Every structure is written in structure tokens, then in C-alpha cells.
Amino acid sequence: MLRAARERFSCTGYAGTSMDGIAEATGLGKGSLYGAFGGKQGLFRLVFDEYCTAAVEQARRDLDGPDDEAFARLATHVRAVAVATAADVARRGCLLAKGTAELAEHDPVVAARSLRTLDELEQILTTDIEACQRHGDLDPAADPNALAVLLLAVLRGIEALGKGGKDEAALHTVAETALAILPRP
């Protein structure tokens, strides 16, 4: 049920999603939805939280491991974002980006969850970059947190470019360029 609601929000955004549309997508009556979630906002917040949790868990799985494989994991992760974005032919984009852009200004719960997610993703990237530095794949004098913020911006940018219609080659070029400019020892 939550997956169907997430798909509806991903396709049409918060403002473009009605309770009738959610009821249709989930097969539940509007009364049941209001009873369970208090309304569209409550349901969106739950779906958004679960999406953010899954994004962080995926990044952690992608980037956790021994130091000698850290750069390979990082490269695979960056390239995977480009591949997944290119595969999104409907150009729905990322619910984290969509929800943040649409609601963070007016919904403090969404704003806080978005910031927490970005902070967690940044920390996961920082940890992997530090492993790359320990192993000798990246310059140990470089600021690992600054590199993590840069890569986080690149990853979010790849998703935005894909949503905007940039082709697969452009997305892969961004990913490869980001990896190429990381400071080597």
C-alpha cells in the first residue's frame, strides 16, 4: 500500500496527488486513508521518511567495506546513480529531491527529514573517502568532508539533469568527470 502511494507521489508530486488518486492507487477508501494517516500530509511524510531511510541504507550498503575496495565502491556508486537516472525514462526523479523542492519551505517535518538524509549521505561519502585516503587512492591532504559535499552535489545534480531530460551520455560524462577530478596522491 505504501509502495503504491509512493509511486503516485513520485509520478505527480505532492500538489498533483489527490486523496482520490491515492485511494485509486492503493485500493483503499478515502475514509480508511484518513483514519490511518490523518490525510495526505501524514501519508506523504511517512512515505517520504521510508524513501529517505531506504536511500541512506542503499548508500551505506554500496559504500561500506574494506579500505582496499573503497575507491572501486565509490566509483560504482557514482556510476550507478547515472545508470539509474538514465533508466528513469518517465523522468519521475528522486522523491527526496521532489519532496524537498516542493515542500521543505512550508513543511518543517519534510525539511528536517531532508536535511537529516543529506547529512547522513554526506557522512557515508566522507567515511568512504577517508578509506580511499587511507588506502592511497585519494590525496590524504584533501578535506574528505569537502569532497563528500562535492560528490553529494554531483549525485543530486545527476538526478536533476536526468529529470530535466539530459541523455544517458551526458549523465555518464558527469559521473566520470566527477571521479576524474577527485585529487589523487
Describe every region a protein language model picked out:
Residues 56, 68, 72-76, 108-134, ...:
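Amphipathic alpha-helical packing segments from all-alpha helical-bundle domains
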Residues 46, 60-92, 144-151:
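Hydrophobic alpha-helical connector segments
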Residues 29-36, 41-49, 129, 151-152, ...:
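A generic structured-segment signal
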Residues 76-84, 119-134, 154, 164-185:
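C-terminal peripheral helix-coil segments that are non-catalytic and often amphipathic
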Residues 4-42, 46:
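Helix-turn-helix
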Residues 92-97, 140-161, 173-181:
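Hydrophobic alpha-helical segments that form the core
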Residues 73, 87-109:
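Amphipathic alpha-helical segments used for helix-helix packing
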